[in-house]
UniProtKB/Swiss-Prot annotation:
InterPro entries: EF-Ts_dimer_sf, Transl_elong_EFTs/EF1B, Transl_elong_EFTs/EF1B_dimer, Transl_elong_Ts_CS, UBA-like_sf. Residues 79-82 are annotated as: Involved in Mg(2+) ion dislocation from EF-Tu. Belongs to the EF-Ts family. It comes from Vibrio vulnificus (strain YJ016). Pfam families: EF_TS. The keyword Membrane does not apply. This is Elongation factor Ts. One of its GO terms (cellular component) is cytoplasm. It is found in: Cytoplasm. Associates with the EF-Tu.GDP complex and induces the exchange of GDP to GTP. It remains bound to the aminoacyl-tRNA.EF-Tu.GTP complex up to the GTP hydrolysis stage on the ribosome. It comes from the Bacteria.
């Protein structure tokens, strides 16, 4: 039996799976929709597809390091409970190991582990997403994980303890750049415009406002850069001062936090659930 667009549409509506997945299932069953559904249920594809619409904003950051290269991987799920599940952590660890071994892109990792991901979704009943991967290279690397939620890798020069402490600082203080001079010109220009407007709205003449802004801009670039921030373990000193004292330096760093940029779905209140039930 020929696999028609109508059959593919029917299978998609009944399983919630993707078009190509449905077409493949129908080709394998010679157009038999019922058998295709049965096969997809057995493989977990139908169940996984239904879970795919669920927001996966929990999860964990995984770090692996070898021969001067470190990989940070974010894998998401829907609940903190599953983020600690052995099946989930084993899957993510396998993905991270492959990323480190092959320097694979996120798209390559997603494609390579799609079948295993689908099977795991079917097994644990939550949507799972291989979301982000980043690499850091350097002669001296230090990593730090704060629980499962935040992962940091720092590359630089210096003793292991100092670089580890810097990684902990990055986890806590969220710097965006290494040095104040690394802040992009467009970011500086945009912030300057805002600060000039604020100063002028305070009733200051433009020439005075401009001078005030210079001080504010220095503060701004310091706040968003690692070396300009007060060191979390010795707040009276900047990170730059700590690095100088210890004969260390930072070349680059990467900080990943679970769920950054993912919009979590708001749960319904009890009253909203009752109202919705009455409408139904």
């Amino acid at each position: 039996m020929a696999v028609t667009a109508a059959l593919v549409k029917e299978l998609r509506e009944r399983t919630g799976a993707g078009m190509m997945e449905c077409k493949k299932a129908l080709v394998e069953t010679n157009g038999d929709v019922e058998l295709a559904i049965e096969n997809m249920r057995k493989s977990g594809a139908a169940k996984a597809a239904k879970k795919a619409g669920n927001v996966a904003a929990e999860g964990a950051i995984f770090i692996k390091e070898e021969n001067g290269v470190a990989v940070l991987l974010e894998v998401n799920c829907q609940t903190d409970f599953v983020a600690k599940d052995g099946n989930f952590t084993a899957f993510a660890g396998k993905v991270a190991a492959e990323a480190l071994a092959s320097k694979a892109s996120i798209e390559e990792l997603q494609a390579k582990f799609e079948e295993e991901r689908v099977a795991l979704v079917a097994k644990i009943g939550e949507n799972i997403n291989i979301r982000r991967v980043q690499f850091v290279e350097g002669t001296a690397l230090a990593s730090y994980r704060h629980g499962e939620k935040i992962g940091v890798v720092v590359a630089g020069e210096g003793d292991a303890e100092t670089l580890k402490h810097i990684a902990m600082h990055v986890a806590a203080s969220r710097p965006e750049y290494v040095n104040p001079e690394d802040v992009p010109a467009d970011v500086v220009a945009k912030e300057r415009e805002v600060q000039v407007e604020i100063a002028m709205n305070e009733g200051k003449p433009k020439e005075i406002a401009e001078k005030m802004v210079e001080g504010r801009m220095k503060k701004f670039t310091g706040e968003v850069s690692l070396t300009g921030q007060p060191f979390v373990m010795e707040p009276k000193k900047s990170v730059a001062e700590i690095l100088k004292e210890r004969g260390a330096s930072v070349v680059t760093f990467v900080r990943l936090e679970v769920g950054e940029g993912i919009e979590k779905a708001e749960g319904l209140s009890f009253a909203e659930e009752v109202a919705l039930a009455q409408k139904g």
